[in-house]
Amino acid sequence: MTMHDTPSGLNWDLGLAPPADGLWCGLRLVAELTQADQPLPADAPACLVVQGGMLRWVGPQAQLPAAFSALRRFDARDAARTGAHGAAPGAPGTLATPALVDCHTHLVYGGQRADEFALRLAGASYEALAQAGGGILASVQATRAASEDQLFALAMPRLQALLAEGVGAIEIKSGYGLALEHERKQLRVARRLGQACAVTVRTSFLGAHALPPEYAGRSQDYIDLVCQQMLPALAEQGLVDAVDMFCERIAFTLAETEQVFLAAQQLGLPVKLHAGQLSDMGGAALAARYGALSCDHLEHLSADAIAAMQAAGTVAVLLPGAWYTLRGQQRPPIEALRAAGVPMAVATDHNPGSSPALSLLLMAHMACTLFHLSLSEALAGITTHAARALGLQDSHGLIAAGRPANFVLWPLQEAAELVYWLGHKPACTIVRQGRVVRDGLGLLDRPEMPVLRDGA
């Protein structure tokens, strides 16, 4: 496995990172993000037991079963420094959360679209740029021109920036190839990224993202190609975990969306949908009828669609970065989603056009300030509900016994600070897949172990 230098300063190889097996003591757990074996008192430290890379016990430190008492200890109680970003004096321990989950990204692409940013600042609309051959199609041209290795090299620092912030699972879409060989290239890069960084990657085939220029005026022919050739071939090669598409007036119709969903259903693949970003075409209600994992964007959403999503258990994925960048005027109907009990996730939507964002914590902050989520909703949105949006609810997004050890320790006084600070990158300790891939809090008692500490 190759070591990777990144702008974040991380330089690690999971194969060299030490195992996290032992007792992680002196912790403060977030009740909403934890399934404990015993009730968690608010004023007493908690403990996690890791064995074989799995969480074996979660609960109050004072009630730790004797069978685990002889295990190696990682004492985090005094690890978080006092001060502006440190633990409060007398706090019961160091804050611990599940590893974060970024459930909507377009991480693999060529080029960038800073020129369009300048045009939008001068008054051009997202739709006008797309209709003029820019937007998604500009990224298609750059992505088609890049080799697989070039796309991998471009995507690696983007992924590493998210991992350094505590992300432990991520979705990566295709959709900038719009031809079999180029969609395959994107999805292969996504798989390689997951293997190289030993991070959980869920791929989404987004072949119906936009109409490629060679199919101008022949939308139905292209959808037939997607359903009859591209999707079956990519699924057979094991490159597709879910099927996504863009149902919008500048993209594809409701009937075309259903055709793609039927093709996915025949292959046993779950679906998700870019829906209601610019207008309400009924896509969210349709996606819910097909049991979609998620509907994403949702600025324009009817009451009937909300009811359908609730009944289907479909997650509403909020993308404040895109709304902010495109100067959105209509917010997603948060109150109605909340009242209906629809789970809400938050994601970066990292892409070169509408959301060049590489901080999931910043997106959580924006979801609160721009969309009026509560702090607890935002935290669940980047952990528990985000995992559900990827079908990973049984393995990610929650600290619980029986799950892989994927958690983060933060030098913060309270969980609200994860959402509160702007642009702050806490020196966290990260455990992923049962190994300590970063020890920003300096908890390891064997300094010769090859784990990055601050300044390394």
Curated annotation (Swiss-Prot):
Pfam families: Amidohydro_1 (PF01979). GO terms for biological process: L-histidine catabolic process to glutamate and formamide; L-histidine catabolic process to glutamate and formate. GO terms for cellular component: cytoplasm. N-formimidoyl-L-glutamate binds at Y176, N351, G353. Fe(3+) binds at H104, H106, H274, D349. The keyword Transmembrane helix does not apply. InterPro entries: Amidohydro-rel, HutI, Metal-dep_hydrolase_composite, Metal_Hydrolase. Zn(2+) binds at H104, H106, H274, D349. It is found in: Cytoplasm. GO terms for molecular function: imidazolonepropionase activity; iron ion binding; zinc ion binding. 4-imidazolone-5-propanoate binds at R113, Y176, H209, Q277, S354. Binds 1 zinc or iron ion per subunit. Its cofactor is Zn(2+); Fe(3+). Gene3D superfamilies: Metal-dependent hydrolases, Urease, subunit C, domain 1. The keyword Iron applies. NCBIfam families: hutI. Catalyzes the hydrolytic cleavage of the carbon-nitrogen bond in imidazolone-5-propanoate to yield N-formimidoyl-L-glutamate. It is the third step in the universal histidine degradation pathway. PANTHER family: IMIDAZOLONEPROPIONASE, IMIDAZOLONEPROPIONASE-RELATED. Belongs to the metallo-dependent hydrolases superfamily. HutI family. This is Imidazolonepropionase. The lineage of its organism: Bacteria, Pseudomonadati, Pseudomonadota, Betaproteobacteria, Burkholderiales. The gene is hutI.
